[in-house]
Amino acid sequence: MLLELLLASVLGFVIYWFVSGDKEESLPLEDGWWGPGSRPVGLEDESIRPFKVETSDEEINDLHQRIDRIRLTPPLENSRFHYGFNSNYLKKILSYWRHEFDWKKQVEILNSYPHFKTKIEGLDIHFIHVKPPQVPPGRTPKPLLMVHGWPGSFFEFYKIIPLLTDPKSHGLSDEHIFEVICPSIPGYGFSQASSKKGFNSVSTARIFYKLMLRLGFQEFYIQGGDWGALVCTNMAQLVPSHVKGLHLNMALILRNHYTLTLLLGRRIGGLLGYTERDMELLYPFKEKVFYSLMRESGYMHIRATKPDTVGCALNDSPVGLAAYILEKFSTWTNSEFRDLEDGGLERKFSLQDLLTNIMIYWTTGSIVSSQRYYKENLGQGFMAHKHERLKVHVPTGFAAFPCEIMHVPEKWVRTKYPQLISYSYMPRGGHFAAFEEPELLARDICKFVGLVERQ
């Protein structure tokens, strides 16, 4: 009798798992108000205003004075980047920042694309909107929303934008031409931060959906990595009929019984359908998954619990802010860069570009609000949000970059995104795909869009 009850329970669980998992359920769209105080009476101002990044001599002088008052602790002998950012190499970066980096010139570069702001749910939302310089007769550019993560910004997309808006001039096929919109997540860079608790990725997705409607787009493509991947996923869950296609270079697969099979070992993994490339990227399991996640997720626990405390230090010290952020651009680009004295930073990025991203955080004072995003999204615990339990029912493409913090096999992606139509093993690259390998990412986006358009 007990055996029969046990078997019936297991069978019931299996049926529930598959039935509940396959149900095409979307998130409720709802509404919100995140500005200070109560929502005012009347309609919100929906005007779209031109915006320019600005700076001043006072801002630059203050930065230089703070750098001049540096107080560093010498690194341990032969520690390289295993203890975090190596202060010997940090001295080189600070010297460049203080004496060679030209913030005014970088502001001009930032302003080379059109910037705008508009009020949505009480927040001033910043975005860049880049249209193709020319469109062949009879063609219409495809709207593409691209969403950044942490510790990046809208600046991550500056090198990929011309490949998408003007591909022919950059040696790429012009079969697909895009009109690119890159917003700043509220609390990041030039987008106003929420004044209230609870502003998470779903709230962001809803605001960005309203932004696209305000720009006149009823249907559009979306792309993201890091937090951008979650925001875009939530958009597809909120308004699937408006999302023509979802392209990701990172996936947060939380409800996934397949992950347990990794513990069975490499040979069993092969029998369960993982490819040889999956095996290379996931094994040895302890080093490439367990230890890797332990090494790289410490910051996340602080932010998901008490983000404001460390934020006080980072918002007051440009040196501390730079070390904190640049360390991620080292090991999240390639974990083996821990073994290098300079963290491998200049192998993939220029100091000019890295410091431009730092300056966006520094001049806007947005490091604290950007960290609060972790508490709002992760602070309630595992599987606490409805969107974590829902699948995504829009055409999906995934670019698996080999040096991402953790590899996500195709069969895992498909559990969350059953309409996966494109999965690409990328030849190189890590977490910051658009910043590090813009051409590879652009080509994969175009390949995915081509598949969607031919469906």
UniProtKB/Swiss-Prot annotation:
Active-site residue list: D226 (nucleophile), Y374 (proton donor), H431 (proton acceptor)
Principal place of residence: membrane
InterPro entries attached to this UniProt entry: AB_hydrolase_fold, Epox_hydrolase-like, Epoxide_hydro_N, Epoxide_hydrolase
Swiss-Prot/TrEMBL catalytic activity: cis-stilbene oxide + H2O = (1R,2R)-hydrobenzoin; 1-(4-methoxyphenyl)-N-methyl-N-[(3-methyloxetan-3-yl)methyl]methanamine + H2O = 2-{[(4-methoxybenzyl)(methyl)amino]methyl}-2-methylpropane-1,3-diol; 8,9-epoxy-(5Z,11Z,14Z)-eicosatrienoate + H2O = 8,9-dihydroxy-(5Z,11Z,14Z)-eicosatrienoate; 11,12-epoxy-(5Z,8Z,14Z)-eicosatrienoate + H2O = 11,12-dihydroxy-(5Z,8Z,14Z)-eicosatrienoate
Entry EC number(s): 3.3.2.9
Membrane disposition: Single-pass type III membrane protein
UniProt entry keywords in alphabetical sequence: Aromatic hydrocarbons catabolism, Detoxification, Endoplasmic reticulum, Hydrolase, Lipid metabolism, Membrane, Methylation, Microsome, Transmembrane, Transmembrane helix
Protein activity control: Inhibited by 10-hydroxystearamide and methoxy-arachidonyl fluorophosphate.
EC category: hydrolase
Record-level Gene Ontology MF annotations: cis-stilbene-oxide hydrolase activity; epoxide hydrolase activity; oxysterol binding
Source superkingdom: Eukaryota
Residues exposed to the Cytoplasmic side: 22-455
Function: Biotransformation enzyme that catalyzes the hydrolysis of arene and aliphatic epoxides to less reactive and more water soluble dihydrodiols by the trans addition of water. May play a role in the metabolism of endogenous lipids such as epoxide-containing fatty acids. Metabolizes the abundant endocannabinoid 2-arachidonoylglycerol (2-AG) to free arachidonic acid (AA) and glycerol. Binds 20(S)-hydroxycholesterol (20(S)-OHC).
UniProt name for this protein: Epoxide hydrolase 1
Lineage of producing organism: Eukaryota, Metazoa, Chordata, Craniata, Vertebrata
